């Protein structure tokens, strides 16, 4: 197994460190997590049914092994109180009442959530929702787990999509915490215990001048979509290396255009369709005209912010830039061929000017910001 596959294997473990219904049974949540890990593990040797999870995964001590990313994610996604019991007055209720309150992270809004009757019932629903996730590699499996588990769970019970990560501070979902934990796991220094995260801000431009050149509504849409598509390709270059959970902004899960740049992963997942005809996950998601409309929405902005390993920040930025240049050249070459077909004559003399224009657009800028090792150095920066 190469280093990237080993990393994604660890990220799957980190992602599953908490079960999505943890808030319904805090005392048993570690056992629930192990149950999910056992159910989805793709490196399953023959006769592994009786193996302990630690033996199955090759992780000597499952929870101590990944608490550093868990603690980093907890610090990032919630307000830290002076002690563990502070702030308990605003708790998410459940389990006996089967009702809980989740709060908006930026405002005073609240929402009542009707929870599954028991934690065991929630586990059953969650197990059933990812039973069909199969993949050939840990990278693809992590992508599908990140992309589909929450969505499939919500289809069974909408409450499973919004259960909070912390019963004392119910203003962010467990899924956000799982995403961040996996993202921090990818930031381990050389695969060791120490985390070395950094922010990567990547941007295409100039957007206003490019959009202003539109002479029709169709031009306006085409320009917006091109920028959105190219940014999606840049994001894919990063997420292929460290997973989609690493992207802080924009929120990628469920965006049609991001699914489109990752189409090959969806098409590898096969099902039995109607009349026993082969079907793919891509067809199930976007096989209808109504669903396919979302593929034409330019929903990715011209920039993204990602949590990346500090030691690889520049490399990942370069990968993203190269992906944009490569995709724009592919699109440009196709357009040039079509232009030649429409002109019905030799236009090869136009090629140098055509390529020069492609070199000038877009302007790509990126910036990295490594996290400081301690509070004093962070405050001094």
Report each predicted region and the residues it spans:
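Regulatory and interdomain segments flanking nucleotide-handling catalytic cores
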Residues: 1-381
């Amino acid at each position: 197994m190469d280093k990237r596959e080993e990393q994604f294997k660890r990220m799957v473990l980190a992602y599953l460190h908490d079960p999505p219904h943890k808030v319904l049974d805090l005392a048993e949540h570690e056992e629930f997590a192990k149950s999910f890990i056992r159910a989805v593990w793709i490196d399953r040797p023959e006769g592994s049914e009786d193996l302990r999870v630690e033996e199955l995964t090759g992780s000597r001590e499952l929870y101590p092994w990944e608490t550093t990313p868990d603690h980093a994610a907890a610090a990032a996604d919630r307000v830290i109180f002076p002690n563990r019991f502070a702030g308990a007055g605003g708790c998410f209720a459940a389990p006996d009442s089967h009702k809980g309150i989740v709060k908006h992270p930026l405002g005073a809004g609240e929402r009542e959530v009707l929870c599954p009757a028991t934690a065991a019932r929630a586990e059953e629903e969650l197990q059933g929702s990812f039973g069909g996730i199969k993949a050939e590699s840990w990278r693809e499996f992590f992508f599908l787990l990140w992309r589909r588990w929450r969505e499939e769970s919500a289809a069974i019970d909408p409450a499973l999509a919004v259960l909070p990560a912390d019963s004392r501070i119910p203003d962010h979902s467990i899924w956000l915490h799982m995403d961040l934990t996996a993202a921090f796991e990818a930031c381990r220094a050389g695969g060791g215990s120490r985390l070395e995260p950094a922010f990567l801000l990547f941007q295409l431009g100039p957007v206003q001048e490019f959009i202003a050149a539109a002479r029709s509504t169709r031009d306006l849409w085409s320009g917006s979509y091109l920028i959105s598509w190219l940014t999606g390709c840049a994001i894919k270059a990063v997420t292929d290396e460290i997973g989609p959970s690493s992207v802080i902004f924009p929120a990628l899960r469920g965006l049609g255009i991001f699914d489109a740049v990752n189409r090959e992963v969806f098409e590898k997942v096969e099902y039995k369709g109607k009349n026993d005809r082969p079907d793919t996950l891509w067809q199930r998601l976007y096989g209808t005209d109504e669903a396919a409309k979302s593929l034409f929405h330019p929903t990715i902005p011209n920039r993204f912010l990602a949590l990346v390993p500090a030691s690889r920040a520049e490399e990942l930025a370069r990968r993203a830039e190269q992906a944009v240049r490569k995709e724009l050249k592919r699109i440009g070459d196709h357009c040039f061929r079509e232009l030649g077909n429409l002109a019905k004559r030799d236009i090869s003399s136009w090629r140098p000017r055509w390529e020069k224009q492609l070199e000038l657009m877009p302007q790509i800028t990126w910036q990295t910001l490594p996290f400081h090792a301690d509070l004093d150095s962070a405050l001094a920066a």
